[in-house]
Design a protein with these regions (language model features):
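Transmembrane beta-strand segments of Gram-negative outer membrane beta-barrel proteins
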Residues: 29-43, 61-81
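Gram-negative bacterial Sec-dependent N-terminal signal peptides
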Residues: 2-23
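Outer-membrane beta-barrel porins/channels
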Residues: 25-40, 48, 104-125, 136, ...
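Active-site-surrounding "flap" and adjacent substrate/cofactor-binding loops of secreted or lumenal enzymes
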Residues: 79, 84-114, 119
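Short Pro/Gly-enriched beta-strand edge/turn motifs at strand-loop
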Residues: 130-134
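A beta-strand signature from Gram-negative outer-membrane beta-barrel systems
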Residues: 52-56
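Short glycine-rich, polar/acidic loop-and-turn segments at beta strand-coil junctions
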Residues: 57-59, 67, 72-76, 83, ...
């Protein structure tokens, strides 16, 4: 069993599976509070009860006595994904990519003569990483994700201080698809979760108009990924050209001279293809305790107007877990061919290639990961006795990803 640190390429694959910051934003604050979610989370200046622990802990001063809160949220990730290629699409002169090309085996051209146009790779079901099982679980097509939340708060009679804690999920998102889905190279199964299981909080009423508050979140962070791998780049395209053009006359006539001159790359049973499946990678990483904090201010000069601000800190982590990679035959054959030639062995050493590519490999893995900081400010204004307007502006430091 090997132990490695996750390289930037693998990290990029994980985050590309999350479809950039847009997908992350979709999962942010999805399962914290129903009322806040229905208002687009524009509640920084409008106290959402115990859930103010997350949105603005200063608003906890609005609670009187003992209060509990239990909620259940259902979410369905019915996400549409479309893929297309630009005009002139090719990799080292090849464009017969079966993902976007209709050409069958009867067409011998290396250039696609009939592109498919837009290719759909829709999400088919919700996937979640289950901590106890330490693996991802598919909920099945059409079954929504269920996210329960619970909290308790207490403000002693006559006191200016409020104490609270809650359990909620500030970030939870996951999706999956069956084999053959066009989106599987961006993640066949992806799960990104942050569950806050304890959040001791305190709020203080400075005066009738001003309150301040703080909370400390103790969270569980997990990332799960299963993705097909392929690398449609110029190097792989060149290797295909060598296999199909240069090596063809020597496939059945190998000798030591051709092995030395051609680096052993013709001694393969299957050549590299930029559009072929390179393998499949599975990852499961987690951290049981990831602390962060929230700081909030609430100013209510009148009953009709209020202003609130909240800062939610980042959380830097070293996620640890396991990986498993199933390698396709082509990369195994490439390394096997290079190792059959003395010049191929020299080239492999220069390029840092391994001496062998096993059919599968697994081991321990670690990854530096940062949950991004977030700042939000908002106002609440009662236009009429029965009409209220909430307006919030937020910023999330997704560049940390």
């Amino acid at each position: 069993m090997y132990k490695i640190r996750l390289r930037p390429l693998a990290a990029a694959i994980i985050l590309s599976g999350c479809s950039s910051a847009t997908f992350a934003q979709l999962g942010q604050n999805l399962s914290v509070d129903i009322r806040s979610l229905s208002m687009g989370n524009a509640v920084t200046a409008d106290p959402p009860g115990i859930s103010a622990i997350h949105f603005n802990p200063a608003a906890l001063t609005k609670i009187e006595g003992l209060q509990t809160d239990v909620q259940g949220i259902l979410a369905n990730f019915d996400i549409k994904r479309e893929f297309s290629v630009p005009a002139g699409y090719n990799v080292f002169g090849y464009s017969d990519d079966p993902m976007v090309c209709n050409d069958g085996p009867e067409v011998s051209s290396d250039l696609c003569t009939d592109f498919k146009g837009t290719v759909n790779g829709d999400v088919e079901y919700v996937s979640l990483y289950v901590p106890i099982l330490k693996k991802m679980v598919d909920l099945g097509e059409g079954i929504p994700m269920a996210a329960p939340t619970a909290g308790i708060a207490y403000k002693p009679p006559g006191s200016k201080m409020t104490f609270a804690t809650a359990m909620y999920a500030p970030l939870v998102a996951g999706f999956g698809a069956e084999n053959g889905n066009a989106g599987n190279y961006m993640g066949q199964q992806v799960a990104l979760e942050r569950i806050t299981y304890l959040s001791p909080s305190i709020a203080y009423e400075v005066n009738d108009a001003l309150s301040i508050g703080a909370s400390v979140g103790m969270s569980y962070q997990a990332i799960g990924l299963k993705t097909d791998l392929r690398f449609p780049n110029e190097l792989i395209g060149m290797l295909r050209m060598i296999d199909e053009v240069v090596c063809t006359p020597f496939k059945e006539n190998q000798d030591i001279i051709t092995d030395i001159l051609l680096l052993g790359m013709c001694n393969t049973e299957e050549g590299m293809n930029p559009f072929g499946r390179f393998g499949q990678m599975q990852l499961a990483l987690e951290q049981s305790l990831s602390p962060s904090y929230n700081l909030g201010v609430l100013w209510e000069p009148t009953e009709d107007f209020s202003f609130g601000m909240v800062y939610q800190s980042s959380a830097k982590m070293r996620l640890k877990g396991k990986y498993h990679i199933d390698n396709a035959k082509a990369p195994q054959e490439l390394i096997k061919g290079l190792m059959s030639s003395p010049t191929g062995q020299i080239l492999a050493a220069i390029l840092g290639f391994p001496s062998v590519v096993p059919a599968s490999e697994s081991g321990l893995v670690s990854m530096d990961f940062e949950y991004p900081a977030h700042f939000q400010a908002g106002v609440k204004y009662k236009v009429l006795p029965d009409l209220q307007v909430n307006f919030d502006v937020g910023w999330t430091d997704y560049k940390a990803w």
